[in-house]
């Protein structure tokens, strides 16, 4: 009797169920197998991992190959600066989105986007215009990425593909470009300076905006100190 009721319920809603099935299949396959098919630099290192030589990538960017290892300092800095609820959401942060909507409406212009780190990874991989429609697509893809990858992997994808000013892409390339050392060897101050760059990569420019960069870095360091990081 119970089975017959379920069968009747499904029969009455067969088109809705079919549509839901199609949407689920589309959702499952919506994420590309390779998020970043972009070319990378040829990198030559010694036995200790120190850089001996590197060539620019075919697209003119200093983009080192993907590195699954992300220094703890950078992870703490970027989460504190970009997405403090990163470890607790599934790709989208309703609190951040609500705050962004209020700020934008109050200021009558785009002040905040409310994007999570996961959404930023998706945006970096797609390179599409920044508008509301694309933001909605990024949100859907971000939830799918959260099912497909660990939080550590998402941080690593961000660190390897975020822009760090000029034609420098990725944390490791930025570390060598600006400090001449591996990312693992950077101080908290140096790492904090790099962590604020992807949000405004134009901050790094010879003789321009250095004060703004230092202010953002110091604000991040103060936030980390107050959180006893």
Can you describe what each PLM-predicted range is?
Residues 2-229:
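Juxtamembrane regions of bacterial inner-membrane/periplasmic proteins
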């Amino acid at each position: 009797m119970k089975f017959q009721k379920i069968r009747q319920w499904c029969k009455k809603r067969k088109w809705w169920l079919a549509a839901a099935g199609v949407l689920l299949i589309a959702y499952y396959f919506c994420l590309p197998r390779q998020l970043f098919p972009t070319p990378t630099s040829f990198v030559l290192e010694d036995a200790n991992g120190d850089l001996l030589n590197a060539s620019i990538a075919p697209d003119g960017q200093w983009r080192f190959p993907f590195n699954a290892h992300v220094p703890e300092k950078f992870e703490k800095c970027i989460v504190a600066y970009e997405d403090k609820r990163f470890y607790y959401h599934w790709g989208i942060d309703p609190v951040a989105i609500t705050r962004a909507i209020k700020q934008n409406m109050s200021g009558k212009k785009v002040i905040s986007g409310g994007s999570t780190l996961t959404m930023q990874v998706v945006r970096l991989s797609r390179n599409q215009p920044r508008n509301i429609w694309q933001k909605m697509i990024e949100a859907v893809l971000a939830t799918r990425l959260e099912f497909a990858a660990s939080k550590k992997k998402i941080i690593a994808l961000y660190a390897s593909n975020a822009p760090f000013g000029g034609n420098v892409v990725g944390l490791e390339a930025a570390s060598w470009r600006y400090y001449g050392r591996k990312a693992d060897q950077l101080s908290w101050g140096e790492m904090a300076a790099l962590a604020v760059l992807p949000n405004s990569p134009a901050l790094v420019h010879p003789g321009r905006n250095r004060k703004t960069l230092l202010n953002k870095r110091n604000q991040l360091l103060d936030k980390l100190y107050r959180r006893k990081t």
